[in-house]
Amino acid sequence: MKTIIVFLSLLVLATKFGDAKEGVNQEQKKEVTQNEFRVEYLNEMAAMSLLQQLEAIESALFEKEAGRNSRQKRCNGKNVPCGANHSPCCSGLSCEETFGYGWLYKSPYCVIPSNG
């Protein structure tokens, strides 16, 4: 019987002091969760800022690529039609009417300039 009374008194004391600690623990949990949400919010804001910076860099790179793709076409090589409707001849070649192709296709061709 003495043992049961001791265990019951310990149970009552543990219940009483356990509730007091539980209230303190709940306050600590609230503080921790509020701090975590603040940190998460700040981390999220930093991530959004970083994302905006990356998008700006990406758009700048795409503009450069678009500029590269829209460059003028390459020059025409030897025995290729040239003129107003065609690309210019490469360096070292001139756009001339030739006997071989010009009379048939009615357009000048890129040829090596004649010295004469």
From Swiss-Prot:
Its main location: secreted. The keyword Disulfide bond applies. It comes from the Eukaryota. It holds the Pfam family Toxin_22. The keyword Zinc-finger does not apply. Residues 21-74 form a propeptide. Expressed by the venom gland. Keywords: Cleavage on pair of basic residues, Disulfide bond, Ion channel impairing toxin, Knottin, Secreted, Signal, Toxin. Residues 1-20 form the signal peptide. It is found in: Secreted. One of its GO terms (cellular component) is extracellular region. The presence of a 'disulfide through disulfide knot' structurally defines this protein as a knottin. Belongs to the neurotoxin 14 (magi-1) family. 06 (ICK-Trit) subfamily. Ion channel inhibitor. This is U16-barytoxin-Tl1a. It comes from Trittame loki.
